[in-house]
Amino acid sequence: MLDVNNFDRMRIGLASPDLIRQWSSGEVKKPETINYRTLKPERDGLFCERIFGPTRDWECHCGKYKRVRYKGIVCDRCGVEVTRSKVRRERLGHIELAAPVSHIWYFKGIPSRMGLLLDMSPRSLEKVLYFVAYIVIEQGDTPLMKKQLLTETEYREHREKYGNRFRAGMGAEAIKELLVEMDLEQLCRELRQELKEVTGQRKVRAIRRLEVVEAFKNSGNRPEWMIMDVIPVIPPELRPMVQLDGGRFATSDLNDLYRRVINRNNRLKRLLDLGAPDIIVRNEKRMLQEAVDALIDNGRRGRPVTGPGNRPLKSLSDMLKGKQGRFRQNLLGKRVDYSGRSVIVVGPELKLHQCGLPKEMALELFKPFVMKKLVEDGHAHNIKSAKRMVERVKNEVWDVLEDVIAEHPVLLNRAPTLHRLGIQAFEPVLVEGRALQIHPLVCTAYNADFDGDQMAVHVPLSAEAQAEARNLMLSAHNILNPKDGRPVATPTQDMVIGSYYLTIEREGAKGENMIFASPDEAIAAYDAKSVHLQARIRVRPTARLQEALEFAKSEARSFDEQGRLMTTVGRLIFNSVIPPKVGYVNEVVGKKQLGNIVARCYDKLGISETAAMLDGIKKLGYTFSTRAGITVGITDVEVPEEKRRLIAEADSFVEKVEQQYRRGLITEEERYQKVIDIWNKTTDGVTQALMRTLDKFNPVYMMANSGARGNIQQIRQLAGMRGLMADPSGRIIDLPIKANFREGLTVLEYFISTHGARKGLADTALRTADSGYLTRRLVDVSQDVIVREIDCGTHEGIPVEAIVDGKQVIEKLSDRLTGRYALEEIVDPETGEKLAAYNEEIQADAAERIDQLIKQGKLAHNAVYIRSVLTCRTRYGVCRRCYGRNLATGRSVEIGEAVGIIAAQSIGEPGTQLTMRTFHTGGVAGDDITQGLPRVEELFEARKPKGLAIIAEQDGIVRIVDNKGRKDIEIVTDDGESHHYAIPYNSRLKVEDGQRVQAGTELTEGSVNPHDMLRVKGIQGVQTYLLREVQRVYRLQGVDINDKHIEVMVRQMMRKVKVEEPGDTDLLPGGLIDIADFEAENLKAIEAGLEPATARPILLGITKASLATDSFLSAASFQETTRVLTEAAIKGKVDPLLGLKENVIIGKLIPAGTGMSRYRNIQVLVGDEIDEARLEDGMA
């Protein structure tokens, strides 16, 4: 077997007949499989032991040699080599064909490679291969043309007329002859010449032919190898035959397909020996060709061969294709040992880095470790007795188990694993019962709840795996979310309501304005029930409190005249778990504030302090939410008094609008729009009235206001009015639901509201699948983006400013700058302080300040130039400076970080939260702009969007002209040229007469076609557009994603250029090539004094970009497996194994993190060796 770690590239190509014979261990001559009586393989059959090796370890077929001592002997009676039976997984056989057959991939694939080489249409080729027509091989001195097709009758006529002066044939033999005599060099020269002379369709055809010819010429594959004389037979263990209980046999479909090939082949041999008539032989040859086609790719041509029950048989191609194929099922999705799964329950007393592991489960998972320890400690004499002890569960076993699991982390995973936080490491704590216990703070990351969710446990075995789990995957180290750098382990639900109740201030409570000498005294008074938890009190600051106040926000420092702190007992208790350096919290704490506290703590004090603080907040939160005893009853839902008046007003307004409509003063469309506006305003009015009337201590209000559960919209439906609903098509019904759930809905109102509810459920189901598929494509396109060096040395970057949509700020400038490297020095004009230095990271406070200065217009320009992944020059992957900060750690990104995968997960994971719907908000018909998930997909796939906007292609002044009742636009450029744009009837203009526009400005509403944007505004224009649009969709749904993740994707979409003129290089016109390769080719040409090639950048959708990758393994395991492999084989492609996927497929360590060669090729030197090495270095 080959050693996986010993090679660094992998090549694929066409196998010549001689090579196949060389691989083979013997020829399969009979279609038999196994003998039905003895159940032993038949000799020379598909399972023959002589060819493929023995079925039992160290035992020959006839039984003359048994035992390992005869290893390597070939039995003289049965010819079987005595060896391990697992050779039956690797030994190939072969079938010698009586007549050559074509390989269906190369004849039937699109484009047909054989057809392009021979310059024949696939239809004519099919006629020849399947014995319908003759093809002229040598025309001699006859008027026939070479490669001309002749029907049976034409062939006979010409035979009678010219005798043997010409040669024609049919079937794969004829094609093979034509392929053998091809001169690729000559053909290549002719085609390159032809390219210079022809245009249009003929040029396209010539380019495609040249591609195939060049591929054969450069790869060393011969064209005639596309026709097979020998067929390899895959090892029998890969197409097994097993006996079922009833004595019947289940067999792999491949055996059936091979059997048909062998039967037909043997029959053909017999017919040829007998000298049968031509027509019978031809028919048999055609059947052989069809049998081989079915074996290689069943169903590609004609009707698929079916097995029992009309099920199409699975051919070799089907074994590789799709989710159940070899690539995705076995190579990328392996099963693991040492794992278990169980239901999860909450473990509120666990620490952040712990999980509760059921005892019986732990014993089974750590069995080998326990057995080893039992022997070491002398409880058992040998492994066998230790095993018996464990199986009988003796008392000593539990003590040993405790020792074994100490310091041994386990991994917990919840499906679906949408991002890397879906697998985290914990230290196990043994618990009774059979359920896993989960710390409540990691639920957000797992998206877990306790309504019956299950989780899987995995045990990292090797020391390296344990170190990795502990240092990188421990839950306490994953407090920040990689997608936006915000804390993901923030308290939720009960903990939030507890903290909220603890820190809220109640006026007129018992003990108000009492004065205490220290926080401890205040807390003692609360314990003695002399002061209420939420009463406002005054406290003299102690040393710890003083320190906390120094770090606190200015609002928190409210003192009375004597310098005593004004606060509440609850806040003192809350601050007892907050480290002083985070600052004293003197405000009402809801979910948002908790998030900020965690972020601040992580920033200032690091991981261990934050984890301890989180556990403190968790404990307090649970304690006080229990003490508060917050409950919800129907009386807590109070309907505001003003509701009746507001609704009556709205009804009268609507009546007026209806009257205007009936008199014909307004159109149906205007009526609809007005009614909807009236009801939207009324709904808002009722909601505001509701919020005014609700008491600050109303449990429903407290829940929503603190962020523990629910929101204003839901309270509105409970106690305000439900408002407008949409019908099944998404159009808003202009009859609102005036009632709320407290009052109860009428039958009609209930019916109207069911549309929305049902659509919501259907949407969710569809969305999950779509989002998953989008994530898969994103991962595939970016999986080889790894941080490979510190600095790529580029001086380019991108300008960034706040992303604005109309009046609404979608993404603040400070969010876009934090943690990125600046390309220019920025100095504060007021203080002269340096806010950003060239090639250094911009910190959060500096980013905020730059944002302020730009808003006040105090900096020279509005955009800040930063280093970006989009302009990074690293060949495979990105560099540290262009990427900037790793959001999951808050520090600069490490070399070896797989930032592509992180980006894909960060964009894909929130995908399920995006809505599906296309909004039809009244307005103009046909103006439905796609939004939500479909819009993200449309952008990443670079599709032409629905509802196209027309964009200006020049800079100039807009003139709006009337053209037969519709508005058209003319743009007058600075040199006086006028350009006309026809505007469709139902489009709305976005520009005004006399406005100055730049190229790329949208003239009408809608979405821009990104390919037009690339043409008009160039690479940077389209990159900014895609980034802005994707951000818009996510931010409008309230999902924050950092720019850099989207940049990684956009960069992968823009990796290729299309060659226009090849100049004197070897590039093919119209070919796609990586920018870096293109530049290298041109550099070579210029150095040699030749003419360089020209090319234009193109934008590929993520699916296309994944398939256009350098790695054929990655592309084949993604989609269109057969097409990718066909092309790769003809080109003799070499896979450089740089991405993660390829290495997982072949079983190598992935080249990320410590798997990178720079971390692995390290020599450890000791003592004197170091001095010697230094001397050598000095001499070198």
UniProtKB/Swiss-Prot annotation:
One GO cellular component term noted in the UniProt record for this chain? DNA-directed RNA polymerase complex
Q: What is its EC number?
A: 2.7.7.6
Q: Which cofactor does it need?
A: Mg(2+); Zn(2+)
Give the reactions, separated by semicolons, that this protein catalyses.
Answer: RNA(n) + a ribonucleoside 5'-triphosphate = RNA(n+1) + diphosphate
Detail which positions bind Zn(2+) 2: 792, 872, 879, 882
Q: Annotated Gene Ontology MF terms?
A: DNA binding; DNA-directed RNA polymerase activity; magnesium ion binding; zinc ion binding
Keyword list, A-Z: DNA-directed RNA polymerase, Magnesium, Metal-binding, Nucleotidyltransferase, Transcription, Transferase, Zinc
Annotated InterPro entries: DNA-dir_RpoC_beta_prime (IPR045867), DNA-dir_RpoC_beta_prime_bact (IPR012754), RNA_pol_asu (IPR000722), RNA_pol_N (IPR006592), RNA_pol_Rpb1_1 (IPR007080), RNA_pol_Rpb1_3 (IPR007066), RNA_pol_Rpb1_3_sf (IPR042102), RNA_pol_Rpb1_4 (IPR007083)
Enzyme class, first EC level, given as a word: transferase
Q: Which GO terms describe its biological process?
A: DNA-templated transcription
Aminoacyl-tRNA synthetase keyword on record: no
* Assembly description: The RNAP catalytic core consists of 2 alpha, 1 beta, 1 beta' and 1 omega subunit. When a sigma factor is associated with the core the holoenzyme is formed, which can initiate transcription.
Task: Give the family, as the similarity comment puts it.
Answer: Belongs to the RNA polymerase beta' chain family.
Record function comment? DNA-dependent RNA polymerase catalyzes the transcription of DNA into RNA using the four ribonucleoside triphosphates as substrates.
Protein's name according to its UniProt entry: DNA-directed RNA polymerase subunit beta'
List the gene name. rpoC
